[in-house]
Amino acid sequence: AASDVYKRQDLKIVRIMPNTPALVKESMSAVMPNEFISKEELDEVLVILNSFGKTEVVSEKLIDGVIAVSGSSPAYVFMMIEAMGDAAVASGLDRKRAYKFAAQAVLGSAKMVLETGMHPGELKDMVCSPKGTTIEAVKKLEEYGFRSALIKAMEACEKKSKEMSK
């Protein structure tokens, strides 16, 4: 198993889980050095990884959860942007602009989470006016299990990752 190799004393290993936004220098890479990597060696690795995004050093035991929340999540976001675009096209926008609006909304929302330090739920609540359009959409997302679907999908991803590492 991968975990057995990771513990070999004769090997210096840094396990890395980047994601596809590395293609636009926006990767979020999990970095898991084994105990035989020096701080200087780790710093060299981080310089390379930070050249195409952000990094976070995490424990090896968290890899499966990291894969679900970061390694695989660009696919979930792409699906959401595609669905948002489809809905916008159905309401009259051309596809190119529909995707542009959807993608920019996702990008800006992500930046708000990262830069404000506010809880995502609090940020969501700031958009929802009483009896407004957004709260109606949020109610439908809850009715159709949006959050539950994401959680279940990530649990399945984590489970599959654990199975594949055996």
What kind of region is each of these model predictions?
Residues A1-Y6:
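Short, small-residue-biased leader/transition segments that mark boundaries at the very start
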Residues P21-L23:
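Short, charge-patterned binding micro-sites
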Residues A103-K166:
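NAD(P)-dependent Rossmann-like dehydrogenase/reductase catalytic/cofactor-binding core
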Residues I13-V14, I63-A68, P120-D125:
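Short pre-catalytic strand/loop immediately N-terminal to key active-site residues, enriched for Gly-Thr
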Residues R8-K12, M28-G65, F78-E115, K160:
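Internal alpha-helical scaffold of NAD(P)-dependent oxidoreductase catalytic cores
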Residues S72-Y76, K100-F101, M126-S129:
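A generic short alpha-helical patch detector that favors 3-5-residue windows
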Residues R15-M17, M32, C128:
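Short beta-strand segments
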